[in-house]
Amino acid sequence: MTPVTPRPPIERRLADAGLPPLPRTAWLEIDLDALAGNLAALRGVAGTGVPVRPVVKADAYGHGAVPVALALEAAGADGFCVAAFDEAIELREGGVRAPILILYPVPVAFVGEAAGRGIAVAAGDDHGLAETIRAASGLDPARPLHVELEIETGLGRGGFAVAEVAAAARLVAASRGLELAGLWTHFQAVDDPSITAAQVAAYDAAIDAIALAGIGLPVRHVAASGALMTDGMLAYDGVRPGLAVYGLVPDELASARLPAALSGLRPVMSLVARPVRVVELPTGTGISYGPSFRTARPSRIATLPLGYADGWARAHSNRASAIVRGGRVPLVGNVAMDAVMADVTDVAGPPVDTTDEFVLLGASGDERITAAELAQERTTISWEIVTGMSRRLPRVYHAAAGPVGLRTLTERRG
């Protein structure tokens, strides 16, 4: 085990950067240099001149939508994708100026505001499109609502059937206040080439139908992270990576051979905590509610101030570990709403105390705890690990020089 040099306390690092202290000693660290590097790597795979529109829905996969989008915009992102209207508005009000696409239907009450703020909307069925056309009929043709048609190619979740796409495109092209801006689909299983090939064939058939109808082809895009990692030829006119922007590989591709350009993807998020208490407990002491764990010897137990209300799921009880001083220690007892306990009895050196930092997600020394590892512990996927990190966990944004911003429930800096 490589010895780890302790960092200055988070309070000092923030103060040195002119930032206020955190309201608690559990926080997420978001590496903006890694974020920019990941975007550059994905752009390299997509190809020269292919627009990259990162997906920043779900609070940028738990990383913080506005700070992440602003950093990506500064790094050259061509636009962004979100899932809901208020997610798009949050970006605009946070200062994001790049184009935004909402990937799910938008209530017609917000059509006018979407057009006025330069936010594109998706349409994937006749009823929803008809309502959007009616709502947009009074819009200024000089500032039309951009509409992107979703095509059902096999995911079974939404979109126009291939046979319906040309008619839908005609309606949009002929409607006052609307502009046909895109044509997209989403893949079901990028690790299965036969399924993906069938979806690509269906998508290409839809493109051909629109071309035969004499309608100018809009921007075509199909590739999220998985498709971009497995087949860069699917870039078409743009790509919309999600998980990979944050340095993570889709779980189904964990053993796949990825493009060399993506070998340097770096996880952006780390979860760090300092104990609020470290105490010696006698043999037979029950730890946390239940209790599902009792000390088998005199033990030194550290209480970390985060729990299932923060996204550290109860399913991690007696399964997970943390890294302290470069080595792993077990997390013991049932995860509580606001606390989880670590057994630090065997940590070498001076007794662990409340100045020690614990890494629950991320790297320290030679050790790394990945989102994929945590996902396996709770029988889920990496997406759920990062998106499940609660808003009440402070986010500290940093670059090579140290902290450059933070977000808590009460303020955002940087």
Predicted ranges, named:
Residues M1-L32, A36, A40, G44, ...:
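Active-site anion/phosphate-binding pocket segments in diverse small-molecule metabolic enzymes
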Residues P9-R13, P21-L22, A26-G37, T48-V222, ...:
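Active-site-proximal beta-alpha core segment in soluble small-molecule metabolic enzymes
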